[in-house]
């Protein structure tokens, strides 16, 4: 994980740790001109590692985004941001996207009153995301919310959360300015 962060820069969905400054790293002493291929590859890898996707999943999302009207890049980021695991991360119910994937896989999360155990589930506007009524599920989410470093003001405007009921609501499709990943 840390090798990926050192290579590609800060990936907030992968871990909360930040890479060291460029002066400390030996491999950045040489300034080599970066080719167009390398730039595109690094940006693709940022997407893959940040959202926890396989190559095949990313290609499928690119194909879907290409069919929709509008900028393919913006539509791709909207598709990735509307995944259930990413929404849990944005709501502060999990500290990282892999942590959110684990919550979903272990069946702690309900969407509109139904258990969803697929992290790539595409959320729609007006979806209500809650935890199971079991004490263990509520305790897990409570720990994440209590230890969250993200203040309530930084919650994207397409999401609302009720921390006391462990409930989140998707208001609308995400606006491009709220996407936390810097992509060229």
From Swiss-Prot:
BP term (GO), one: ribosomal small subunit biogenesis
Alphabetically sorted, this entry's keywords are:
Chloroplast, Plastid, Ribonucleoprotein, Ribosomal protein, RNA-binding, rRNA-binding
List, alphabetically, the Gene3D superfamilies matched: Ribosomal Protein S4 Delta 41, Chain A, domain 1 (1.10.1050.10), RNA-binding S4 domain (3.10.290.10)
Superkingdom per UniProt:
Eukaryota
- Coarsely, its chief localization is plastid
TM stretches of this protein: none
Q: Name one cellular component (GO) term.
A: small ribosomal subunit
What this protein is reported to do is described as: One of the primary rRNA binding proteins, it binds directly to 16S rRNA where it nucleates assembly of the body of the 30S subunit. With S5 and S12 plays an important role in translational accuracy.
Any idea what this protein is called?
Small ribosomal subunit protein uS4c
């Amino acid at each position: 994980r840390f090798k990926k962060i050192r290579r590609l820069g800060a990936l907030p969905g992968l871990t909360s740790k930040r890479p060291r400054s460029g002066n400390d790293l030996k491999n950045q002493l040489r300034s080599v001109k970066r080719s167009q291929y390398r730039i595109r590859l690094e940006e693709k890898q940022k997407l893959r590692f940040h959202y926890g996707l396989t190559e095949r999943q990313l290609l499928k999302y690119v194909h879907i985004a290409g069919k929709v009207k509008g900028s393919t890049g913006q539509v791709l980021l909207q598709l990735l941001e509307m995944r259930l695991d990413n929404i849990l991360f944005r709501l502060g119910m999990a500290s990282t996207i892999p942590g959110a994937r684990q919550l979903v896989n272990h069946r702690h999360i309900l969407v509109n009153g139904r258990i969803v155990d697929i992290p790539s589930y595409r959320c729609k506007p007006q979806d209500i995301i809650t935890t199971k009524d079991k004490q263990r599920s509520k305790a897990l989410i409570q720990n994440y919310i209590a230890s969250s470093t993200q203040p309530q003001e930084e919650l994207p405007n397409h999401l609302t959360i009720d921390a006391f009921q462990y409930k989140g609501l998707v208001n609308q499709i995400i606006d491009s300015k709220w996407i936390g990943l810097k992509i060229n």
